[in-house]
């Protein structure tokens, strides 16, 4: 599921695809890896 701004969720995990972030496209983000985190219930 996509929440916009590069944020996606699948079951209990969400991640940010930095390639979709405007700041990344603008070259202000240096780390090309996705940012992962778990959803808090």
UniProtKB/Swiss-Prot annotation:
Keyword Hydrolase: no
One Pfam entry name: Bacteriocin_II
Keywords recorded for this protein, A-Z: Antibiotic, Antimicrobial, Bacteriocin, Disulfide bond, Secreted
One annotated Gene Ontology cellular component of this protein: extracellular region
Top-level taxonomic group: Bacteria
Gene Ontology biological process terms from the UniProt entry: defense response to bacterium; killing of cells of another organism
Record-annotated disulphide pairs: 9-14
Protein name: Bacteriocin
